[in-house]
A protein has these predicted regions:
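Conserved pre-ATP/AMP-binding loop-to-beta segment of ANL
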Residues: 9-11, 140-162, 169, 195-201
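ANL superfamily adenylate-forming
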Residues: 19, 106-154
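Conserved AMP-binding A3 loop
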Residues: 24-28, 158-184
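Conserved structural elements of the adenylate-forming
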Residues: 31-36, 154, 173-194, 202-205
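Conserved ATP-dependent adenylate/AMP-binding module captured primarily in the ANL superfamily
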Residues: 50, 81-113, 183-203
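Conserved coil-to-alpha-helix start sites within the AMP-binding
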Residues: 56-67, 82-86, 105, 206-219
């Protein structure tokens, strides 16, 4: 939001389509899309404090959902694409996940198979999850989003990130909004000139389920 105010016309995201075409988004455009997505999530019934998991590769959709969820006080729970069925089941149960967004139908089916009796909404990008969110935004206003955003405290949990689980079940680490603000400010103190330069281009290939990739996205 800060950058959207200071540099609304600066390109902050470049995404490449399956046919190789590149689409650029400015800070102002990204903010508007995040707000609209947040409206849709509220329309779908996502409440403050709800845990919402994302099982998908690094993508614009991941960024969009994450920022929208954080802006309305929900908690993002990343799931690695490489996680096993038992690890996914553990994460869903341990974090009390209420909704999951996946990249593919196959991933959605895997989630449903490990928690068949679990009250859980599952949507995949390849089956129109983003369009579903957009439709749900119809009766929600930006003022509703602003009200939810104003109620978010720096001490509120922003995300629960799970370890790889190499020595047992994955262990969840809760990070607050203040945690991310502190690390982002630290990064900007060292790399501020690079981060704010319109000439800077960064290729993010890390899985966004990793905390370092999240930090890179935020700064």
């Amino acid at each position: 939001a800060d950058r959207a105010i200071k540099f609304p016309h600066q390109v902050v995201v470049e995404q490449r389509s399956s046919v190789g075409a590149t689409r650029s988004l400015t800070a102002g455009e990204l903010q508007r899309q995040v707000e609209y997505t947040a409206c849709g999530l509220i329309g779908l019934g996502v409440k403050s404090g709800h845990t919402v998991a994302i099982l998908a590769p690094t993508s614009y959709e991941w960024l969009l959902l994450d920022l929208a969820l954080l802006s309305i006080g929900a908690i993002t729970v990343p799931i690695y694409e490489s996680d096993s069925a038992s690890q996914i089941e553990h994460i869903l149960t341990d974090a009390h996940v209420t909704r999951v967004f996946t990249a593919t139908t196959q991933q959605a089916e895997l989630v449903r198979s490990v928690r068949p009796s679990f009250t859980l909404a599952v949507d995949s990008f390849d089956q129109g999850a983003i369009r579903k969110i957009a439709r749900a935004a119809t009766d929600v206003t930006i003022k509703d989003v602003e009200k939810r955003r104003a109620a978010v405290s720096s001490s509120d949990i922003a995300t629960i990130i799970y370890t790889s689980g190499t020595t047992g079940n994955p262990k969840g680490v809760a990070l607050t909004h203040a945690n991310f603000v502190a690390t982002s400010e630290g990064a900007r103190q060292v790399l501020g000139d690079v981060i704010d330069s319109p000439e800077t281009r960064l290729l993010l290939f890390l899985p966004v389920a990793h905390v370092l990739a999240r930090l890179v996205m935020y700064v």
